[in-house]
Amino acid sequence: RPMIRHQTGPKDLVAVQSAYTAMDANADVHPFINDMAAAFAWADLVVCRSGALTVAELAAAGVASVLVPFPHAVDDHQRVNAEFLVRGNAGHCVIQRDLTVETLAQLLRQSRDQLLQQATAARALARPEAAQTVATICEELAA
């Protein structure tokens, strides 16, 4: 039986908790998750939006993902962000209007081997040295 950890925001907390309770789902619902690194480490699969920092964190954590880009993002940048992980075989992108119960259920039924392959691919895309690289370039330009 799947275990769910869901960040809702404070506005939707009670409604989401009630929905999971009604379904007898094994769900831990939070208005906000302070330690996202720990949450990603706990997860086999993350379903989320695809902001730039989120995509970078998914790669750094080495976790498989289903990315649902925010449909009103400027210049559709969240879809572009999601494609980075998709091209690297690290996740799936589902446009919000195409997200159905059936589509999500199919993605949630991926085998452990598939999830592990995606997680490994995500980790390979990570650039943990990026901040140091940018700092070095800035120092060189300033010199």
Please report, for each region that a protein language model flagged, where it lies by residue:
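Donor-nucleotide binding loops and adjacent catalytic segments primarily
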Residues: R1-C48, R79-E83, H92-L104
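Residues in the short beta-alpha loop(s) of Rossmann-like NAD(P)-binding domains
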Residues: T8-K11, P71, P128
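A donor-sugar binding/catalytic signature common to diverse glycosyltransferases
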Residues: M36-Q78
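Two-component system phosphotransfer/interaction surface
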Residues: L99-D113, A135, E139
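A short, well-ordered alpha-helix in the C-terminal region of glycosyltransferases
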Residues: Q114-P128
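C-terminal alpha-helical cap of glycosyltransferases
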Residues: R127-A143
